UniProtKB/Swiss-Prot annotation:
This is Pyrimidine monooxygenase RutA. Keywords: Flavoprotein, FMN, Monooxygenase, NADP, Oxidoreductase. Belongs to the NtaA/SnaA/DszA monooxygenase family. RutA subfamily. Gene3D superfamilies: Luciferase-like domain (3.20.20.30). It catalyses: uracil + FMNH2 + NADH + O2 = (Z)-3-ureidoacrylate + FMN + NAD(+) + H2O + H(+); thymine + FMNH2 + NADH + O2 = (Z)-2-methylureidoacrylate + FMN + NAD(+) + H2O + H(+). The lineage of its organism: Bacteria, Pseudomonadati, Pseudomonadota, Alphaproteobacteria, Hyphomicrobiales.
Amino acid sequence: MTQAKDHAMNIGVFIPIGNNGWLLSENAPQYMPSFDLNKQITLKAEQHGLDFVLSMIKLRGFGGKTEFWDHNLESFTLMAGLAAVTSRIKLYATAPTLCLPPAIVARMASTIDSISNGRFGLNLVTGWQRPEYAQMGLWPGDEYFGRRYEYLSEYAQVLRELWETGRSDLKGEFFQMEDCRLSPRPQAEMKIICAGQSAAGMAFTATYADYNFCFGKGVNTPTAFAPTVERLEEAKAKTGRDVSSYVLFMVISDETDEAARAKWEHYKAGADAEAIAWLGLQGAADTKSGADTNIRQMADPTSAVNINMGTLVGSHATVAALLDEVVTVPGTGGVLLVFDDFLKGLDDFGTKIQPLMRSRRHVTGEALAEVA
């Protein structure tokens, strides 16, 4: 097994802003999103020395027996609340760019920067699920699928101009600024995340973003995402910018490999077929963006019970060793984790998995147990 002795890994948590987290299963924990739950999760992440938390935005769910993602909080207001009760951990909100003008998002980000004393960053999404926006009369038509990164490029230019200079006069196809002002500006450099996996998404990330988020792939195959990172490296070569990749994984751990595998099989056995079918229909709606989009992977029937993110299943020692392999892929800066049970999962991660990870020695500062 590859050992990550010389690689340091940053770790974040994809907090459950929507009901039931990331498992479309009747056999998984069923819960509603709340500020209190996400506060507990974020404080645990901070306590265990994790680096950041990110919340998504979801404006309409998938239905089914579990009402998957039918119940969601709003990302910016949630992160503003979390900014006020944390002291060290970095916080990222997600901007639904079809709903919010860039000048408003720039000001909201600057406000949370003030609340957090410089610990805030922004995830930009173009919008891929038509019903989220059509319900509000904001869907621009299906031709948008083919032009969404042109739209997002102008959006990001407005953000950068306002944050860096306090003023934008951008005259584009989608946005026309006229002496648009922002003050106060953020006290810290505002980092941008993008999770686009299409060729256009990669080109956008290499030009405007600081981090690229991509899906891990498979079960206990921690480096199978490497071709995705290689595509970003090719895009970066054209822009010369420093952009690192962060990889999304679900952790399902227990005291033994067998116990963890039993949980995973139980979740799969309770898969919410109706919600999964809805996800597939939404993925098929985009005929413009090519085969490499996130939604294509999410809707793949192979492991749709957790939207086909990379899954690490095993004992705490097994998961630690698998995570150490992730960061050996060149261009990888860290991981974004979700858990089947967030509160217990985070405590187990902090006390039983992280201390075994060579890639987290800079956090634990402990002599690590030998991982077979």
